[in-house]
Amino acid sequence: MLFGRRFHVRANYKVRTTIALHLVTPAGTLLDLILRVTKDQIWPDLLYIVRHGESAGNVAREAALEAGEHMIDIDVRDVDVPLSDLGQRQAIALGRWFGALPPEKRPNIILTSPYLRARHTAGLIAETAGMREDAYSLFVDERFREKEFGVLDRLTPLGVKNQYPDQAEFRRILGKFYHRPPGGESWCDVILRLRSATEMLSREYCAQRVLIVCHTVVVLCMRYILEHLTEEKLLAIDKKTEIANCSVTLYEHDATLGPRGNLRLKLFNFVAPLEEAGALVTSEPDVKIGAR
């Protein structure tokens, strides 16, 4: 029988765990199990957040706007919208940039939205960067998917006003942060699912180098969570900045930020890898973005 026996377990990735077991009575009728977990670091070393390359939906939306159309002409589910030729070149250019980084700066964990354009971007980045299959892990995570627009799917802003004037008015009153179209999501809904994903980053990928390939609203909402922004600050960033395709937002762990350190924003909407490679920089919103 164990009395006050203490076990110390040194876990991976700078995590210190102490387990104390105390049997209070010889009969063992009471087991006092104390699990104390302390972490020197609770965040990844590096967190890259990348918007996918230009998609066929981006191109179709731009054409619909120029023609004054109400609907965006695309014949597949938004989940299945592929990259355009330019989008593939953008992803390849970004992959070369990652490949030129020192090994300790390259991602070893890739998390991607299940949407085809994001998965294709993630695959091209890994392939072009020359990442060996045994040097990284890639996971598809639906929490990083595009914001869902419900009945407003594939409508241009003009189409929303024409077909759903009540929703256009609700959005004007509530603002994009809180407005939830029927069958769709508000920005708050996206933030709710991303909070779960952010907890996973801390729990499973502490001290790792993580790349997330996702969508415009996800990039912005991750900033909202990680930097504890307000609605006003987030919407000010959104108003000022169009998130470019294959742009990089980077957070680095800074041990000086609090007792366990924290993530510090180092890059936002960084497009130099595309410019250096001569790939056109684009920022057209996604196909469903008429009421983003």
Which ranges hold each PLM region?
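Eukaryotic N-terminal low-complexity, Ser/Thr- and Lys/Arg-rich leader segments
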Residues: M1-D45, G258, E276-R292
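Phosphate-coordination/substrate-recognition cap region in phosphate-metabolizing enzymes
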Residues: G4, A27, D32-Y48, A56-G57, ...
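Short, conserved phosphate/pyrophosphate- and ester-handling motifs at nucleotide-, phospho-/glycolipid
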Residues: H52, G87, H215
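A solvent-exposed, charged loop/short amphipathic helix patch at secondary-structure junctions
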Residues: E62-D78
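Short glycine/proline- and acidic residue-enriched helix-loop micro-motifs
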Residues: I74-P82, A168-C188
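Short beta-strand scaffold positions
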Residues: T112-S113, L192, V213-C214
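Active-site-adjacent alpha-helix immediately C-terminal to a catalytic or transition-state-stabilizing loop
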Residues: R119, R195-R260
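Short, solvent-exposed aromatic-acidic interface loops
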Residues: L265-A277
